[in-house]
Amino acid sequence: MSQRTAIALLSGGLDSATAAALALEQGDRVIGLSFDYGQRHLRELDAAAAVAQQLGLAEHHCISVNLASWGGSALTDASISIPTDGVEEGRIPPTYVPGRNTVFISVGLSLAEARGAERLVLGVNAVDYSGYPDCRPDYLNAFQTLADLASKAGREGHGAQLWAPLVQWSKVRIVEEALRLGVPIETTWSCYSGGTHPCGVCDSCRIRDAALREAGRPDLCSSTAA
């Protein structure tokens, strides 16, 4: 049986690195795909390249899609403050980037079809950031239907399948799995701020640090990061 090929969307963060490592554990030949979309935290792309190398991905590509051209998100527009006080239930946080995952998944599916990849690996999570509309199971299910209809491979019955193993996991479980898999957590980048070091106060940093402490690895928290 030939080795399965998977395209992994790799942001440089903990979740996407863990999802890619899970695909590797299952024996997949993994190709990483990252995006320069005009994000303030461009540092994550350096992390993505380093993670791809350390995990031993077969290839790693970085595509430019400048979503910052029209702003609309705290991650692409410096005039919008990055929240530090938690996600308000029932509201979509300002760190949501309009259409980001729809664009990323579409490009990922294009690469998957061109390379004959059987699945597209996503590190999306609906638990910690349930306010994001494009990180939810119903969104992923609907997109799978679209992908099956919108591609030659899908119409022929062998289109890439969206695989989001972390979608219902807690952050603590993700950290524990990352530790088990040997994911280079210290290399990953989760901070939303555009500095050279994690800020430790944005929602992404706080959720990550809380999970690391609960998992018994406070040494990997942003406050101790180099």
Curated annotation (Swiss-Prot):
InterPro entries found in the cross-reference section: QueC (IPR018317), Rossmann-like_a/b/a_fold (IPR014729)
The pathway where this protein functions is: Purine metabolism; 7-cyano-7-deazaguanine biosynthesis
- Please report the organism this UniProt entry assigns to the protein: Synechococcus sp. (strain CC9605)
| Pfam families (alphabetical) | QueC
Q: How is the cofactor bound?
A: Binds 1 zinc ion per subunit.
Q: Which family does it belong to?
A: Belongs to the QueC family.
- Record's superkingdom? Bacteria
Sites where the protein binds ATP = L10, S11, G12, G13, L14, D15, S16, A17, T18, A19, A20
* Top EC class for this record: ligase
What Gene Ontology molecular-function terms does this entry list? ATP binding; ligase activity, forming carbon-nitrogen bonds; zinc ion binding
Listed cofactors: Zn(2+)
Q: Which PANTHER family match?
A: 7-CYANO-7-DEAZAGUANINE SYNTHASE
Q: Which residues form a coiled coil?
A: none
EC number(s): the record gives 6.3.4.20
Q: Where does Zn(2+) bind?
A: C191, C199, C202, C205
Tell me what this protein is called.
7-cyano-7-deazaguanine synthase
| Catalytic activity line of the entry | 7-carboxy-7-deazaguanine + NH4(+) + ATP = 7-cyano-7-deazaguanine + ADP + phosphate + H2O + H(+)
